[in-house]
Amino acid sequence: MATFQEFIQQNEDRDGVRFSWNVWPSSRLEATRMVVPVASLFTPLKERPDLPPIQYEPVLCSRATCRAVLNPLCQVDYRAKLWACNFCYQRNQFPPTYAGISEVNQPAELLPQFSTIEYVVQRGPQMPLNFLYVVDTCMEDDDLQALKESLQMSLSLLPPTALVGLITFGRMVQVHELGCEGISKSYVFRGTKDLNAKQLQEMLGLTKPAAAQAGRGPQQPQVPPSNRFLQPVQKIDMNLTDLLGELQRDPWPVTQGKRPLRSLGVALSIAVGLLECTFPNTGARIMAFIGGPATQGPGMVVGDELKTPIRSWHDIEKDNAKFMKKATKHYEALANRAAANGHIIDIYACALDQTGLLEMKCCTNYTGGYMVMADSFNTSLFKQTFQRVFTKDVQGCFKMALAGTLEIKTSREIKISGAIGPCVSLNAKGPCVSENEMGTGGTSQWKICGLDPNTTLGFYFEVVNQHNAPIPQGGRGAIQYVTQYQHSSGQRRIRVTTIARNWADAQSQIQSIAASFDQEAAAILMARLAVYKAETEEGPDVLRWLDRQLIRLCQKFGDYHKEDPNSFRFSETFSLYPQFMFHLRRSPFLQVFNNSPDESTYYRHQFMRQDLTQSLIMVQPILYAYSFNGPPEPVLLDSSSILPDRILLMDTFFQILIYHGETVSQWRKAGYQDMPEYENFRHLLQAPVDDAQELLHTRFPMPRYIDTEHGGSQARFLLSKVNPSQTHNNMYAWGQESGAPILTDDVSLQVFMDHLKKLAVSSAA
């Protein structure tokens, strides 16, 4: 019999799903007492090398309000060629193509190992990939040159049939016509005036796709509308390479003490409108490359006077950010338009100061786009990250998927409360939609314009079965995730994942529910809720909510005697959860101190889309120690791990940091590694560097690489993350110093746990 841990791991590997609880309380009342809701982290396109796509279409339940897909949980009558839907119990006839099925000749979708299965939709046209580059020209020459080279490189990575367009902007916005031989032709727009799709259509002389197709005979293949602004790579490769090479810095003079006039809001608006007119409801990718904040027109986030800095958290709290609300509204409207048409907006912001990611966050968060933040386009961080957008799978297809929709079906005892992740609601009301919303709720379908194999969403459920209506012994609740998307090869695909979990009576079987708790998934699902709240609520309120939930969980599942904190015990399945909450409270997702609004936005954006493993690293970074005492080993994220004769490697997801202890640092400065008799020291110095390189080469987006030492200014990144078990207040209390004291007033994990136990066992709490 597999342990729960093995069961959880197998389910994640097979179906890309992790639940907070793997046995579900059987009534609404008991479920609310569990504190952590029944919820799942789901990775729709989790890579499965053993999952070949099936070349036929799924069989659907015939009930109009259900339409669930045939799956291994359905009961089948092979003789009568009927199947019963496991969600609504409707009996359905198999289609004629299934005439040959029997107990020994089952279709793949009925086999238990295919609880996740992928279908290729045979009907409909295959659409090419569309890329629209939106390029800022208000930047230093070396930055612009590096960006131009990256864009030219990207053309060689695109399939020959992919369509590419180019919009450049500074004080004006230029839409480049790419079909012209031998001449550069572009339409110039004022950067201060917004245009709607209809105005843009008339100005650029675009025809609506429907009108262009109307005169076509029924036998002719569907061709994309002729379009001078988006052309196949194979046709314009040379022209576009030359055009990019000739791009100059924005010619408008910038006087001393002023920022360049940058019309980012209008440029993005034109990009969204252009795709809206030419490729509605088709996957497309707007890639915006930004070297500074928008300083004029709709969407401006700061004025052009350099003496007036861009808004800080302090300004926002004091309601002193005069452009913020208007700019956010502008970008939110663009994000909704793009999402409605299945178009992705990526933002690559490379500048030393803020660029306005806070105001633009909807553009990426609503459309499943990438947000990348670096100091300059001339850094390996940007260049490598941009190249990884075009990563291919073993078949040579891009790993990106476009224009996705995700629908959830549930058995009648459970309803869907909402989703948290890079999606927008499709407002599909139905019998399985809960009235209590968590995240993006009130629907059972969401649009996810951009997906990759790591894109992960959190789904929150509500048990609706009444307390006095017991579920039969051995009953199971089921959930089906149906993801439809445009594969990068142009095919439409449908991936279906169907899972079931046992019900248990929380009064008589509380032990089996407690044993099924997945503390890692629960911590990240609660963290997503907290970060979602932090976008609209005050920081201290969110921390109080998180603390209250943790205390209630300890009271419900801890073992203790009333009023005796020393008696408190947590079972193994819960023991790490308080530690995750401790680190989450200190994380940049909930603490904005020392981070700009743009940095906080960037951190939260990444957290809301990554899978469980990466999310855990973000909440509680991993620390490895290298020393002469043995092979590299994981050590506690604690100040006691910082020893003079150790090298530490810390992975926070956003940074990879190598820290040399005091003694090691002195040896390195003395040059021992260059002496032949100290070759083992040279190997010790090299080991963490090799391990760091491996992480740097595989992660998206590429992390920042920091090499520091005891007393170095960048050691602050490590010191701010470790649990301060030794501080300047208690460093002499133990009689001898072990580890490095941290100069902080933050409470340590031990103090946090003592306080938590005291509150959990108190009758008043």
From Swiss-Prot:
Q: Which residues cross the membrane?
A: none
Q: Which CDD domains match?
A: Sec23-like, Sec23_C
What is the membrane topology noted in the UniProt record heading this document? Peripheral membrane protein
- Give one GO molecular function term: zinc ion binding
Q: Which Pfam families match?
A: Gelsolin, Sec23_BS, Sec23_helical, Sec23_trunk, zf-Sec23_Sec24
UniProt subcellular location: Cytoplasmic vesicle, COPII-coated vesicle membrane; Endoplasmic reticulum membrane; Cytoplasm, Cytosol
Q: Which GO terms describe its cellular component?
A: COPII vesicle coat; cytosol; endoplasmic reticulum exit site; endoplasmic reticulum membrane
Residue positions binding Zn(2+): C61, C66, C85, C88
Per UniProt, the keywords (alphabetical) are: Cytoplasm, Cytoplasmic vesicle, Endoplasmic reticulum, ER-Golgi transport, Membrane, Metal-binding, Protein transport, Transport, Zinc
Gelsolin-like repeat residues = 632-718
The record's principal subcellular location, in a coarse class, is membrane
Which InterPro entries does the record match to this protein? ADF-H/Gelsolin-like_dom_sf, Gelsolin-like_dom, Gelsolin-like_dom_sf, Sec23, Sec23/24_helical_dom, Sec23/24_helical_dom_sf, Sec23/24_trunk_dom, Sec23_24_beta_S
The GO biological-process annotations, alphabetized, read as:
cartilage development; COPII-coated vesicle cargo loading; embryonic neurocranium morphogenesis; intracellular protein transport; pectoral fin morphogenesis; protein targeting
Q: What does this protein do?
A: Component of the coat protein complex II (COPII) which promotes the formation of transport vesicles from the endoplasmic reticulum (ER). The coat has two main functions, the physical deformation of the endoplasmic reticulum membrane into vesicles and the selection of cargo molecules for their transport to the Golgi complex.
Q: Which family is annotated? A: Belongs to the SEC23/SEC24 family. SEC23 subfamily.
Q: Quaternary structure per UniProt?
A: COPII is composed of at least five proteins: the Sec23/24 complex, the Sec13/31 complex and Sar1.
| Note on domains (UniProt) | The Gelsolin-like repeat mediates interaction with proteins containing PPP motifs.
Name of the protein this chain belongs to:
Protein transport protein Sec23A
Q: What is the lineage of its organism?
A: Eukaryota, Metazoa, Chordata, Craniata, Vertebrata
